[in-house]
């Protein structure tokens, strides 16, 4: 398995993953042929996946210390993203993973029991070795989400545009009360598709209104989800 990351790579993750102009979502199956740097996109441990069969395990409780605020939202072209110079923390596998950024996909990239959701958020964390842990949270269409309402009062319309929130928002308020999760080993879902990522998919489904979902979809102008990838013998724990 390709263990990808140096800390320098992670610190520049927001641009390394989303700003390259030589890939898009029209033919994601060809990503591995576009650039030698993207060869991992044809790997055996790729994300996203369909979580269908799982193995029961005594997974450790997720311990978040998100004591940071959301100040700026940036349009990256392929997503909308919030970066953190000094993020909160996730304790996992006896290590500390620092929150670097979160971004959105619509529709969802990962499926749960074959079901797609209209919105998925990825919280990207890194440890001191530059290894990544991504916490994913799904949104179903339903009632208006108060946190998204405060964040999306004015979304950045153009690629590269940043919007500064008039009132910074606490990122910990985005987390659900129930932190039960699925776990598997995977990759980045965009080029360079680097593997060795610890994926944690929260089971509790959040809600967002049809208008909130539509606002993000219209902003992107296209679906920004990679198709599900083969498990290739990987096990999903819960």
PLM-predicted stretches and their roles:
Residues 18-238:
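Alpha-carbonic anhydrase
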Residues 2-10:
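Sec-dependent signal peptide recognition
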Residues 1-2, 225:
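Generic cytosolic/nucleocytoplasmic N-terminal low-complexity/intrinsically disordered segments
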Residues 14-16:
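N-terminal signal peptide c-region/cleavage motif recognized by signal peptidases
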